[in-house]
């Protein structure tokens, strides 16, 4: 298996047609078909369902597509990291994070960093903590921002001083919007939208106590933006950290803090004892300088 064949496979998967893919790759269609057929034979499984008009992926093909994208991304990161010119720092830094207030701290750090190293491209990948953690372990994300609790074994990190408050989102004309704080009894019997992350749900379960079993959970969501869209359409009340809904227009969605309050700390973390590129090492220096 080589990178070239994976690129061929991904192009066919994208175009869903061998002829169009061959044109994109500047090779003949028979050559492309022959090489991918040999690739399927090497793997011992079919990757494509070949229809009369289009091509779709088998289950094995879908799995390979996901892994192939990770491999291509990792290859590009390696090439970027090796292209450090003397006296000039270039390359790409990938930062994984969710939607929370600490992203404002990240923006402050990135602003200082970009003034010093304008040739470095910063890629922001928005995802759940579990996804970011997995991608860090795979080498696809250099730096992650996590809400606690998070397993910091094997990680170096700094803790952001400002805490994120937990809030309930609602339409501005909702009766709950008239309250200064939302108590757990206000939410019993109402359709709720909870975070998807199990450890966060456990924290909310502790807050609700024995009433947790009475909750009407209409949705779970891994990102606050999508939960906010559901709430704006009257489909539920998202319980999330304040940063996830901070930038909603107040004529669309408002938020009220819960009482008794729950606050959550945030960490910026990176893997320990990893030979990072110079661009990433300089970013870590800026992160540590911010803490100091």
Explain the meaning of each model-derived region.
Residues 190-212, 276-280, 284:
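Secondary-structure junction motif
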């Amino acid at each position: 298996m080589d990178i070239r064949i994976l690129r061929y496979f991904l192009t066919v998967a994208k175009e869903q047609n061998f002829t169009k893919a061959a044109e994109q790759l500047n090779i003949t269609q028979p050559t492309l078909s022959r090489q991918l057929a040999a690739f399927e034979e090497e793997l011992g499984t079919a990757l494509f369902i070949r229809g009369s008009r289009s091509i779709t992926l088998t289950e094995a093909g879908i799995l390979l597509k996901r892994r192939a994208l990770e491999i291509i991304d990792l290859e590009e990161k390696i090439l970027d990291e090796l292209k450090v010119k003397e006296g000039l720092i270039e390359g790409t830094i990938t930062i994984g994070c969710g939607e929370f207030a600490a992203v404002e701290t990240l923006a402050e750090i990135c602003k200082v960093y970009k003034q010093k190293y304008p040739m470095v491209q910063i890629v922001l990948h928005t995802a759940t903590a579990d996804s970011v953690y997995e991608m860090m372990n795979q080498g696809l994300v250099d730096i992650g921002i996590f809400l606690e609790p998070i397993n910091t074994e094997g990680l170096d990190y700094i803790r952001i001083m400002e805490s994120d408050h937990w809030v309930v989102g609602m339409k501005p004309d909702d009766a709950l919007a008239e309250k200064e704080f939302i108590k757990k009894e206000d939410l019993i019997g109402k359709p709720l939208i909870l975070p998807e992350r199990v450890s966060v749900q456990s924290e909310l379960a502790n807050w609700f106590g024995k009433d947790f079993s009475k909750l009407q959970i209409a949705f779970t969501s891994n990102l606050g933006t999508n939960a906010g869209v559901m709430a704006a359409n009257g489909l539920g009340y998202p319980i999330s950290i304040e940063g996830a809904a901070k930038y909603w227009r107040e004529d669309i969605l408002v938020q009220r803090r819960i009482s008794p309050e729950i606050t959550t700390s945030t960490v910026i973390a990176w893997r320990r004892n990893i030979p990072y590129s110079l661009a990433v090492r300089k970013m870590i220096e800026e992160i540590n300088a911010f803490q100091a």
